[in-house]
Amino acid sequence: MKKISLYVFLSLMFCNVSFGGILSEVLKKFEKTSTGCIEGDCENGYGVFAYENGDKYVGEWKNNKSHGQGTITLKNGETYSGQWKNATPHGQGTYKFFNGDKYVGEWKEWNFHGQGTYIYSDGKSDKGIYKNGELVESN
């Protein structure tokens, strides 16, 4: 009985080491393909890029940066969809917050900047000219 138990124990240890090694290799391959450019051309074209923090960008690229039209979906569910310049929102775009608020308008380097409308989840809104993220003139 002791011989059988030892044989079973050694067999299980071998299987665990073998399959554990295989599983480890499979997981490493998955990790490599689940972040970075996962589809298309993320250098100079149209591609999908998954960031390690869970964010994902789908859109146009120029010189390895988001540039042109694109959408980023953040890990928390918020999205920005619109124009990009050198990896920052720049130009016309829409940002949807996880609480239901939304900003539609002009952007400059991740800030509301220019003509835009901030729409609250209750339907109220602030329309006007924004500068560096702040409403400076209502209209």
What are these regions (language model features)?
Residues Y7-N16:
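Bacterial N-terminal signal peptides
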